[in-house]
Amino acid sequence: MAAIVETDNGYKKFVEESLASGSVRENTNRTIDGIKFVTFDCPVNPNEPAITGILSSPGDKTWTLINIMPRLPGLAAEAEVQGTCRWEMLVLGEVALSLGHTSVTAVVPNFDLVKHLMQPGTKRYFRLSATVEDLAVREPTPIIVNEGPLYEMELESFLKENPGKTASDFEPVEISTVGMQMLFPRDYSTIFELASPVLSVKHTKLCDRDIVRLEVILHRWEDEEIRTYLYGTPSQIPEGVKEGSEVHGLIRLYAEPIAETFN
């Protein structure tokens, strides 16, 4: 790190803003494929999850690659592993999950340390979280349906219940979008378009940085509901968002496998 700081002023500024003393968590030193993994406890917020660093010394080079990725506290949900993908940078990876009646792909922090927990076909609990890519307040506007199967079904019911009426007397079907939840994949595997009501808002800190945590609904199907925490900086969260607000935007999903099993 010292060598990089001496030769890269931009990196030096980044380090100066982020640097804090810390301690290596016991029994976390591991070497996988020549890469050393160590976990540091956060000295600023002891109750927050640890920061994990990956150190590598390729060949006979004199520099060291360091990557720091904060873990985002998430909400637990049971999922079935469909497959995994390791990133070329040896830092992170992705996991494809069957989550209730939907499927998602999520970034996995510390991928090499936990990939043994994510064998395809296995079911286990994951801590799910998300970060804001782009977010806006959604004003619920009704959807007007004036054609298609739903319209035809409602029209048929209307004519049966109202003898003497005709199709010209039937108003288009209006569907309320208050409390609407949706999740659609976008261009990149771990990016999704989300619409959800906001269940709670909390202003907190992560690695001594101000962040906002929104509790949102990731997936809903009949009586099945899966929630997650959505994180963003204050500038990423639309002004005036509060419990009961409705939001719509792009998010990036994260999933952390839980080693413990539950009956």
Indicate where each model-derived feature is located.
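Short, charged beta-turn/beta-strand-edge "cap" motif at the junction between a beta-strand
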Residues: 4, 10-11, 245-259
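Short nucleic-acid-contacting surface segments enriched for D/E, G, S/T with interspersed K/R
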Residues: 233-249
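A structural signal for the main folded, soluble domain(s) of proteins
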Residues: 190-193, 205-207, 235, 243
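N-terminal alpha-helical "arm" segments
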Residues: 1-29
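C-terminal output/interaction extensions
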Residues: 226-230, 257-263
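Long, hydrophobic alpha/beta structural blocks
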Residues: 30-187, 191-197, 211-212
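OB-fold (S1/OB) nucleic-acid-binding surfaces
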Residues: 95-99, 103-104, 199-228
